[in-house]
């Protein structure tokens, strides 16, 4: 599959921005706000539930195992014919090419980074979504995505099957597909003030497989009970300028950029009665576009875990998280599909001060490379440890401070025959202040750094630091704080 960076930015952001949902909490547990600079925290109000769409079909009775296989096969046939018509001989599949791929070893392909790390996961999300919207649960849908990816590698292209594509398409695609599937249902359930027809259209934009199967009347496309999770949504639009830039071997240069950003936290811990029984009952999704391309996309969900508490003021969840990260801050690029052990929690320090946070560490199949490199293409693949720490401090209903730190440590695990090492750090710090009701303003600092010995001893650090001002819209009060 071929993928254009600008088109991917427009598509993914459009899917995200089609979700006009608001934070959900128990309105009976809300705290009254007070006048002054340090008003009490008000948990987000319950979302609009007017004119609900029927989602009550029992999922176990509505599962269809044959139809998703047929739909995935039809999708692959149409995609192959399109690619062969417009992109050339790599898709001129024949019985001879299929037989050759069946008997050849799996390799690492050399498609563009955006194709491999954005296009293939999105293609995998289509496979996954077709199974999921036929009523199948997470792990069974993952099996369809894995099988669909293998079939494409062998019979969808004439090139040798690629192990990096198999991983990002099936695993990264399933993580992405589940988040999009739940976003679509969130819109269908809550509506955001939209009429049912517009909700159906928006849900189809977010998850095309779900939209298709709802249009076809497939029973499994209506069979999902969310449990009414607590959510937090934030939209941002603004501009940033470069404070510090060290290109290293990159030929890319861009001092200023316009950016759009969408954030969704789903299933935040603390809501009474909400349970974490299924993969991605909690997830965090963020996409940022800058200058018409995807600058970052991070998607993290709880695969297996449980809730816990500590006293009256702290609620949390812990377990194994699955994640897909994509970073492309102009000078270098990174992608990781990972499993991590971690925890997400909320601490109500006082009536006017609260803290939310996440910490995790794990290992991922990681790709690293340089944007418009002055040296021969340096994209590298392999396993790499990674860590994540995120913190949000909330001051009443007036302001929040967000801090995020990501670290990727790629050394000999990347390539056992090489002593080269790669170290990537991504840090974000932002303060958001309420101007009026749902309208806010944010000041955000982002630093992206890569230390690599791949280019020889003493090679310079690739680094880009930016600061920007953003208009911010939050559909609800409370900055995502959950009441209990």
For the regions a language model picked out, list residue spans one by one.
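Outer-membrane beta-barrel "beta-signal"
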Residues: 433-435, 462-484
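Sequence/structural signature of outer-membrane beta-barrel proteins
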Residues: 152-161, 242-246, 287-294, 323-331, ...
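Alpha-helical transmembrane segments that form the membrane-embedded catalytic/substrate-binding core
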Residues: 123-124, 156-185
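N-terminal targeting leaders of membrane proteins
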Residues: 20-118, 123-124, 132-134, 138, ...
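Residues that define the transmembrane beta-barrel architecture of outer-membrane proteins
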Residues: 172, 254-262, 295-301, 333-341, ...
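Small-polar-interrupted transmembrane alpha-helices in polytopic inner-membrane proteins
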Residues: 137-158, 170-174
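Outer-membrane beta-barrel architecture
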Residues: 130, 261-265, 303-307, 340-346, ...
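Bacterial N-terminal signal peptides
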Residues: 9-20
């Amino acid at each position: 599959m071929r993928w254009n960076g600008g088109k991917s930015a427009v598509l993914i952001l459009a899917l995200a921005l089609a979700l006009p949902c608001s934070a959900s909490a128990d309105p009976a547990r809300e705290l009254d706000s007070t006048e002054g600079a340090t008003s009490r925290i008000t948990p987000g109000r319950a979302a609009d539930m007017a004119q609900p769409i029927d989602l009550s079909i029992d999922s176990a009775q509505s599962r269809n195992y044959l139809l998703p296989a047929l739909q995935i096969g039809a999708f692959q046939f149409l995609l192959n014919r399109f690619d062969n018509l417009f992109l050339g001989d790599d898709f001129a599949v024949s019985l001879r090419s299929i037989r050759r791929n069946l008997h050849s070893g799996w390799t690492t392909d050399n498609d563009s980074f955006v194709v491999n790390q954005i296009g293939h996961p999105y293609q995998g999300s289509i496979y996954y979504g077709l199974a999921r919207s036929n009523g199948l649960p997470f792990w069974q849908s993952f099996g369809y995505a894995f099988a669909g990816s293998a079939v494409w590698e062998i019979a969808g292209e004439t090139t040798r099957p690629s192990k990096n594509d198999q991983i990002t398409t099936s695993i990264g695609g399933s993580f992405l597909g589940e988040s999009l599937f739940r976003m679509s249902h969130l819109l269908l359930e809550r509506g955001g003030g939209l009429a049912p027809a517009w909700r159906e259209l928006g849900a189809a934009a977010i998850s095309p497989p779900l939209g298709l199967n709802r249009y076809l009347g497939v029973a499994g496309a209506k069979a999902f009970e969310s449990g009414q999770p607590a959510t937090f949504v934030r939209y941002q639009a603004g501009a940033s300028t470069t404070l510090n830039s060290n290109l290293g071997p990159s030929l890319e240069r861009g001092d200023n950029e316009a950016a759009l950003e969408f954030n969704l936290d789903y299933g935040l811990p603390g809501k009474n009665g909400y349970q974490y029984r299924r993969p991605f009952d909690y997830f965090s999704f963020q996409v940022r576009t800058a200058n018409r391309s995807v600058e970052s996309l991070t998607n993290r969900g709880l695969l297996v875990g449980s809730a816990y508490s500590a006293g009256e003021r702290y609620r949390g969840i812990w377990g194994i998280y699955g994640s897909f990260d994509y970073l492309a801050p102009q000078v270098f690029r990174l992608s990781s599909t990972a499993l991590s052990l971690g925890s997400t929690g909320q601490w109500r320090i006082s009536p006017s001060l609260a803290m939310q946070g996440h910490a995790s560490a794990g290992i991922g199949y990681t790709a690293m490379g340089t944007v418009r490199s002055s040296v021969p293409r340096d994209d590298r693949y392999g396993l790499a440890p990674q860590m994540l720490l995120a913190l949000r401090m909330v001051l009443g209903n007036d302001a929040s401070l967000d801090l995020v730190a990501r670290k990727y440590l790629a050394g000999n695990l990347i390539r056992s025959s090489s002593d080269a090492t790669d170290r990537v750090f991504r840090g974000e710090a932002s303060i958001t202040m309420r101007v009026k009701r749902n309208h806010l303003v944010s000041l955000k600092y982002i630093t992206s750094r890569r230390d690599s010995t791949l280019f020889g001893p003493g090679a310079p650090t690739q680094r880009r630091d930016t600061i920007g001002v953003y208009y911010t819209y939050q559909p609800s009060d409370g900055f995502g704080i959950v009441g209990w």
